[in-house]
Amino acid sequence: MISRRKIRELIVQFLYQWEMNKGVGLDNMLLDFWDFSPLDQKDKEAVEQWLKEIAEHKEAIEEKINSYVKNWSLDRLAPVDKCILILGIYEILYRKDIPPAVSINESVEIAKKYSTEESGKFVNGILDSVLKDSGRKAWMSCP
């Protein structure tokens, strides 16, 4: 079984590819994605479950991002930063089994790895605001 960090990185990579290929359906993108990211079936199922849930809430998540990005539009965000924010907001709002502080920290670390140091700070600021407005506690999870 792969780590949750690796799941998150694969999701960000997938979301980036999906962002670059607008109009392509989730299932078609997944078929192409697995050609370059071979995993065992159980790990694929875990990643796909997260991705299907993200796709279900993607429009609401993007609206949430728009509401927090001041004097900026979603289209002007660096695509990788947008993908990291989508994942982080999904976890904070929809994954009650993951403490939000963990989601924020993981998102910041992924931003530092795949984007810039400044992106890490930007992602942290946006996700912290989302957390505060969500009413969840930073270390609260509900199994």
Swiss-Prot record:
NCBIfam families in the cross-refs: nusB
Coiled-coil ranges from the UniProt annotation: none
GO molecular function, one term: RNA binding
GO biological process: DNA-templated transcription termination; transcription antitermination
InterPro entries found in the cross-reference section: NusB-like_sf, NusB_fam, NusB_RsmB_TIM44
Family: Belongs to the NusB family.
Keywords of this entry: RNA-binding, Transcription, Transcription antitermination, Transcription regulation
Function: Involved in transcription antitermination. Required for transcription of ribosomal RNA (rRNA) genes. Binds specifically to the boxA antiterminator sequence of the ribosomal RNA (rrn) operons.
Gene3D superfamilies: NusB-like
The gene coding this protein: nusB
Any one GO cellular component localisation term in the record: cytosol
Pfam families hit by this protein: NusB (PF01029)
Record's protein name: Transcription antitermination protein NusB
